[in-house]
Amino acid sequence: MVCGLADLGQLDSRGNKVADFLLVIDMQSDYVAVGKAYHEELTAAVNDKIASYPSDRVIYILNRFFWERKDRKKKFATGLLLVSSRIFEKRRASCFTNPDLKDFLEENGAKSMEFIGVDGNGCVKASVLAAVKENYQVSVDLSAVGVVNQKKFQNILYKWRSIGVAVEGELL
């Protein structure tokens, strides 16, 4: 059963209930930089959310397209708060296509996760849907999610809510 954060027991630095893990999706210089679709405002919102979690509960997901060379180092967005060395790469939209991430979550007894990052119509969407399919309790903070096509995103938001994803905040 998918349920909201009200069912969780962990508290953040402000005493609010949080998920077992925060997954920061694709906050990298390929997408978040001057001249790109997302910029400092999103990075600041993402940093606020990261700062609210214990550092050992923050997981960063980097996207490496299937055609990109593995020896080319991926760079996080300028100014992104890096509090953890838990970094997993993915080569497809969903972060759950990385078996190492799935193993890590299982080994650490994860039952719930919160998603932030980019894009709500792409990799965040795919990862949220995959997490629900894997029977995790899932939440999304829209104030820390980048969305280029907000009209298209309304359908995704409806789908998330209809399958029990806890949605909070407003898009920037």
Go through each PLM region and give its residues.
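Short beta->alpha junction loops
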Residues: 88-94, 143-146
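Structural recognition of alpha->loop->beta junctions
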Residues: 79-88, 148-172
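Short phosphate-binding loop-to-helix
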Residues: 93-101
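Histidine-anchored nucleotide/phosphate-binding helix
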Residues: 45-53, 122-133
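A short glycine-rich beta-strand->turn/loop micro-motif centered on a GG-aromatic cluster
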Residues: 114-117, 135-150
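Active-site acidic carboxylates
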Residues: 2-89, 102, 107-111, 165-166
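Active-site neighborhoods of divalent-metal-dependent phosphate/nucleic-acid chemistry enzymes
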Residues: 108, 112, 116-121
